[in-house]
Every structure is written in structure tokens, then in C-alpha cells.
């Protein structure tokens, strides 16, 4: 992946930023994509390794796009694979489908990299292929969000020749943000079909000490009961959303979608979750309240790991789920294998258990039984 040119600058002028990052949802003549990036190592201090700006033309060949220029630069630096890197982009437009495909490949090949994309605007958000591309980015593990006022101010301070002037939001800035935020949330609110292998192995590995697993992933199956027999109906994958208003965990994402689009009082449901983490106290409480109100829903939760199982609030959350009829269990080998076969783009590769899977299962299962006694 070698673009024919690289167009990088340290900072941009104020008028350039205001023109190209103007967050009006529909704009013409903004044919240059600006990508401000930061690369940090993960850790307590998280030192910033580099921060610059790439430019690219939206109507040129994909290899000339700003996203591809960044990937060429990053891969060309041959940064050590044993270190974990946190990449943040502030972009004037969200990536096109071609760039998204390359980004998904990049993230699959670099499990030590996390990518957050904060966009000023959504590119062709009404077109099906572009909406699917945003969902694919999320499936690949990237975080996608709309730039808010704090992020605009941060870019102004760090990527603009501001000459000491503060960032001043323009007319209808808040209205534009609210519209784009709602639109992106609607695009990403529906469940994904599956996840990529590196996502599954990283987030569902049942380690005793699972450092860096700061996201919750939830695979679900849903059966409706007809003529006293369950009939398979729906399945999918949720992950926690980057939402400055709600910080929506995967469990809340499921409940929101289920209540708005699926739930009927005249239908009985058998729902099974396979989660990377057990629910936090707030989510456990909401799920317990939901089950108390809807006796037509039976829920079984298989979890790869117990979240803060030594904390009494988290223990009480698990007990509240059990008291409202939810079955809470630890994922074992057959459950991981089932998820691999049904919720992962596995290319017909078999599930490969990791060292310590059975031992960790026994440890977590004993802890769960102690909590639920």
C-alpha cells in the first residue's frame, strides 16, 4: 500500500479548518478530506508519539485518500508489534467504502491497534453502501463518533494556527451536531451480523486478568415460542456504543433495539446472550427491571468473564438478575465454539481454544456459584 503522494502538514490555517470542518450535514465543494491524527502508546502515561495532518481528494483514486496515506505512513514506520497503540482520527468526512475495506484489513492484521474516528460530517449517509461501511468499521473494532464541541476545540488548539484565539462555534453548530449524532446512532443501532476473528479472540478470551478489554460485546440468539416449541428467529452482535450522552453498554443497546423493534406482549421469547463481560450494576439493574415487567421473555446469559466479581455492587447486580429469573452461567469450551461458528467471520476455520481456557472456566464458575448462593 504505497500512495503516489503524501500530503502532510503540521497545522492548518484557521479559515481552512473552519471551511473544511464546518459540520453542516450536507455541503458542496468540500472535496478535500482532512485527517488530523494522534498516535499514542497504551498505558498510564500514554505518551503521544506523533500528531500531524493528512490531506486527500475524495474524488481521486482510493490510494490518494487521506486514510490510505495514514495507513501507508503507519505501516512504513514498522512500529513494534509487542506494543499497543491508540490511534485517534479527527476527520472532515467519514471514510468511503473502499477505505473502510482497507481499514478493516488493517485492524485485523494489527490486533495491537485501536482506532477511534471522530468525524465532522457523515459522507453520503443516505446511501446504503456508505451506511453499511460505517457498520463495517464498527464490526472491525473501530470506534466511530461525531465530533462534539470539545473535540472541535481540541483540534483547534492542537492542529490549527490559532494564534491564541479560542475556537468559536458557528451558527447552528449544536443543531448540526445533534442531527449527525442521531443519524449515526440510528445507523449503528441495529445488531451486527458477526465480528472479525481478532475481535472475538481478544474480547472473549476468558483471562483471569483481562487488561485492555474496555468494551463489552454481546452475541445473542432469539427464539419465539410457537405451539409450545421454540423456533429460531433472530441473531446478531452488539457492542457498547461511543455515546457522550449515555455511554450505551451492549446490554442497553440490545434492550433499546428489542423494545423498539421486536417486543410484542402477545409473543413469548427465549433470549440467549453470550457476553465478553458480565453486566455492570446499572445494566444488571435495568435488565432485572425489564424481566420483572415482561414475563413473556426468558433470558439466559453466558459470560466469558466476570466484571469486578470481588465488588459487592457487581455481585448484587448478578444476584438481582438471578432473582428475576435470568440464568447466569460462565462460558465453557462448547459456548466459545458455538460463538465462533455462529457470530464470527471465520472463513470455515475451526475454533482454536487458548491455553488456560478450561482452568479459567473452572475458576470463574466457582466464583459465580459463590456469588449466586
Swiss-Prot record:
Changing residue 251 to A: Decrease in cytidine deaminase and antiviral activity. GO terms for molecular function: cytidine deaminase activity; identical protein binding; RNA binding; zinc ion binding. Changing residue 269 to A: Resistant to HIV-1 Vif and reduces Vif binding but is still efficiently incorporated into the virion. SUPFAM superfamilies: Cytidine deaminase-like. There is a cross-link at residues 52, 234, 334, 352, 355, 358 ((Microbial infection) Glycyl lysine isopeptide (Lys-Gly) (interchain with G-Cter in ubiquitin)). Keywords: Antiviral defense, Cytoplasm, Disulfide bond, Host-virus interaction, Hydrolase, Immunity, Innate immunity, Isopeptide bond, Metal-binding, Repeat, Ubl conjugation, Zinc. The keyword Methyltransferase does not apply. Changing residue 67 to Q: Reduced but not abolished antiviral activity. Nearly abolished antiviral activity. This is DNA dC->dU-editing enzyme APOBEC-3F. The lineage of its organism: Eukaryota, Metazoa, Chordata, Craniata, Vertebrata.
Amino acid at each position: 500500500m504505497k500512495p503516489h503522494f503524501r500530503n502532510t502538514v503540521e497545522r492548518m490555517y484557521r479559515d481552512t479548518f473552519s471551511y473544511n470542518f464546518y459540520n453542516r450535514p450536507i455541503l458542496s465543494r468540500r472535496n478535500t478530506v482532512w485527517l488530523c491524527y494522534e498516535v499514542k502508546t497504551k498505558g498510564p502515561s500514554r505518551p503521544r508519539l506523533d500528531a500531524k495532518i493528512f490531506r486527500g481528494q475524495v474524488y481521486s483514486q482510493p490510494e490518494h485518500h487521506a486514510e490510505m496515506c495514514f495507513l501507508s505512513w503507519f505501516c512504513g514506520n514498522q512500529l513494534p508489534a509487542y506494543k499497543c497503540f491508540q490511534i485517534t482520527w479527527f476527520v472532515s468526512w467519514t471514510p468511503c467504502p473502499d477505505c473502510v475495506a482497507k481499514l478493516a484489513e488493517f485492524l485485523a492484521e494489527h490486533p495491537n491497534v485501536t482506532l477511534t474516528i471522530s468525524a465532522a460530517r457523515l459522507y453520503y449517509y443516505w446511501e446504503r453502501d456508505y451506511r453499511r461501511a460505517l457498520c463495517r468499521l464498527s464490526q472491525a473494532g473501530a470506534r466511530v463518533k461525531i465530533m462534539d464541541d470539545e473535540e472541535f476545540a481540541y483540534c483547534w488548539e492542537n492542529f490549527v494556527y490559532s494564534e491564541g484565539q479560542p475556537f468559536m462555534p458557528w451558527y447552528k453548530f449544536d443543531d448540526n451536531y445533534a442531527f449527525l449524532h442521531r443519524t449515526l446512532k440510528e445507523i449503528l443501532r441495529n445488531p451486527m451480523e458477526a465480528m472479525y476473528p481478532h475481535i472475538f479472540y481478544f474480547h472473549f478470551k476468558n483471562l483471569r486478568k483481562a487488561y485492555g478489554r474496555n468494551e463489552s460485546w454481546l452475541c445473542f440468539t432469539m427464539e419465539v415460542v410457537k405451539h409450545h416449541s421454540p423456533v429460531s428467529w433472530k441473531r446478531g452482535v452488539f457492542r457498547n456504543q461511543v455515546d457522550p450522552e449515555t455511554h450505551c453498554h451492549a446490554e442497553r443497546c440490545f434492550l433499546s433495539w428489542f423494545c423498539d423493534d421486536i417486543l410484542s406482549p402477545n409473543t413469548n421469547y427465549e433470549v440467549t446472550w453470550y457476553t465478553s463481560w458480565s453486566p455492570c450494576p446499572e445494566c444488571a439493574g435495568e435488565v432485572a427491571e425489564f424481566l420483572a415487567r415482561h414475563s413473556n421473555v426468558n433470558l439466559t446469559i453466558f459470560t466469558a468473564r466476570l466484571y469486578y466479581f470481588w465488588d459487592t455492587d457487581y455481585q448484587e447486580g448478578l444476584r438481582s438478575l438471578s432473582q428475576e429469573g435470568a440464568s447466569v452461567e460462565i462460558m465453557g469450551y462448547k459456548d466459545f465454539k458455538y460463538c465462533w461458528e455462529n457470530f464470527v467471520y471465520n472463513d470455515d476455520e475451526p475454533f482454536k481454544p487458548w491455553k488456560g481456557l478450561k482452568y479459567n472456566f473452572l475458576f470463574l464458575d466457582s466464583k459465580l456459584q459463590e456469588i449466586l448462593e
